[in-house]
């Protein structure tokens, strides 16, 4: 510094003392400056005051010499003290050089800068608020200062500034938010602590409504919640808790839609605390905002569904996710199935689209670990809540179905998630069937594939969805409509439904036996497609048929019309080219028909063949049952067509008797001893009126080798009474009863010819296989 330079009105002694390396001498100079400025204030000499401040700023505080800078800082503080309440007129000139020194490399100088600014702010109090942003900016940097003395000094200044903000009603929150939004993404632990402490202060001030600006800082708060420091995480939890209290207290003013995607992002993080907190917020948002959250359903489901499969280690997250899932599901109503009305330009601009997102700010969290989240929840929508309230809330089924399809296709997804997905699909088919049927062709393959799931509960839910698809009135048309969007089109072969016999299937003459369809007993166009696809699945996956076939068919009989299921499957099997599969499938269906409690009503319908409907069903079943000779006989036993059963058994002499054949005869004998054929065994008492029943049973006996089944049937037939011994005097006087005859409306001769034709086809196929050296599979499929 040039000693010859004129620093008036500062005296040479003051200048010399300000440049001294000793603090005490600089302090003496500061007292002189304070006295000098007080005189200028008394004289109202603003020009000289400005000149003193400018000199201290330019020639000292911003000097290259460190001791001069220290002198300038203490001199500026002295000016502020001397100015008192008038310091507000000169705050810009007083503050700026001090803040510049915050960046000084010398830690002692940074400390003196804190001290100087503390004195300036202490005098000015509320007058510093117009300069709050620059003060906050400087303090946020010092909060992370490595020197403990500097940090201690900045904390004193920080507390003073917080007191001023708390007691003032003139805080400019609007201009502060951009700075807060920027600084909240700091990764420094101390800077984060500083930010959180300030947010906590602002939230506590009644006159400051920080809730309006929560969408701009919420993402940053969740970032801080993942800090390694336990204390910072705890502070952040408190802040988020305070915000949530305010949201619950006044939900009408909350911009839920602007924060929805932020929560979606953080619900997918790997940090347990962040995920649980975000999920709790999501739960409250869904319950408080209601249908405002519907446009974000796809993103919410992407975040929530995987959590439902968590184990007990993440039980809390799982429970909250389950509440979110249930609450969101309840928001979907039948009104969402109404045709979409053309939107005005204003509505198009204000309606949120969850798949459109703004570029992510620096420091924003990643989308999370989920395999299906690449298209959802990757950004943050920003729009005003007022417009959102006016815009109609639309359910975006395209995105929801895509998420559900994705999760159901992922074999690594847990059982509870798969069940939740199927519950969602079922719910959507119930509430919005018209729109959902646009997606049925893309969903059908994966729903069929899910039948192979290892969990019975998953298969049950899957069958409920398939049954609803097959029975919903919305599926009556062959052309369910184009998808909502091009993204969901999946390559699949379109099924060609045979026209013959279909009319009766789609409009059944009787609805008896229907127990489970929540929509209607009438089967729609998808019912027949479902039956075709199900049989194709059984044909290609024989293990599925063996392990789950009876279970699946029995459940479908509960959910749908059992008569229609058997009628349609029999009709399809009649055209089956794989005769071995047809025989196996007929055997499976026959076992279900004869033994399942679910088919009690259908069995009763077939017992008497008194109605045209039952006769039509018998003929349809019979033609397919001909693929398996023994099942054909059992069907005749069930329907009490004993004469025709006897005629069939007579034809067995012309068939190729194999081990499999004899095994099935053995099983039929065992079945005759079961409760299902109690009526048949009782009819053996009426020998006179049931001669063909006895003949048929003797025919089976003659087919069997000397085995346990032979002994069983032989003992049963030995119990048949002598008809002459049963005659009483009244019986002899009475006119002879006519035995139960075959139904005159059924052409049994034609049925017998059909049986011979089908069995001839089976014989030819077996001979072809034998000629190729293939051995018959002797395994009996139960």
UniProtKB/Swiss-Prot annotation:
Q: Which GO terms describe its molecular function?
A: identical protein binding; kinase activator activity
Cystine links in this protein are: none
Kindly give the Pfam families that the UniProt entry links to this protein.
Vac14_Fab1_bd (PF12755), Vac14_Fig4_bd (PF11916)
Going by the UniProt record, its keywords in alphabetical order are:
Acetylation, Disease variant, Endoplasmic reticulum, Endosome, Membrane, Microsome, Neurodegeneration, Neuropathy, Phosphoprotein, Repeat
The protein's matches in InterPro entries, at most eight in alphabetical order, are given as: ARM-like, ARM-type_fold, Vac14, VAC14_Fig4p-bd
In the record, biological process GO terms are:
phosphatidylinositol biosynthetic process; regulation of postsynaptic neurotransmitter receptor internalization; response to osmotic stress
Gene Ontology CC annotations of this record: cytosol; endoplasmic reticulum; endosome membrane; PAS complex; presynaptic endosome; vacuolar membrane
**PTM annotation (Phosphothreonine): residues:** 11, 499
- Ranges of biased composition (kind: Polar residues): 493-510
Entry coiled-coil feature ranges: none
Asked whether the keyword Heme is assigned, the reply is no
Tissue expression as described in the entry:
Ubiquitous.
Instruction: Give the protein's function.
Output: Scaffold protein component of the PI(3,5)P2 regulatory complex which regulates both the synthesis and turnover of phosphatidylinositol 3,5-bisphosphate (PtdIns(3,5)P2). Pentamerizes into a star-shaped structure and nucleates the assembly of the complex. The pentamer binds a single copy each of PIKFYVE and FIG4 and coordinates both PIKfyve kinase activity and FIG4 phosphatase activity, being required to maintain normal levels of phosphatidylinositol 3-phosphate (PtdIns(3)P) and phosphatidylinositol 5-phosphate (PtdIns(5)P).
Q: Which disease is it linked to?
A: Defects in Vac14 are the cause of the infantile gliosis phenotype (ingls). Mice exhibit reduced body size and diluted pigmentation that can be recognized as early as postnatal day 3 (P3). By P14, the mice exhibit a tremor and impaired motor function. Maximal survival of the mice is for 3 weeks. Small areas with the appearance of spongiform degeneration are visible in several brain regions, including the thalamus, brain stem and cerebellar nucleus.
Regarding protein family, the annotation reads: Belongs to the VAC14 family.
Question: What's the protein here called?
Answer: Protein VAC14 homolog
Q: What would be the name of the gene that encodes this protein?
A: Vac14
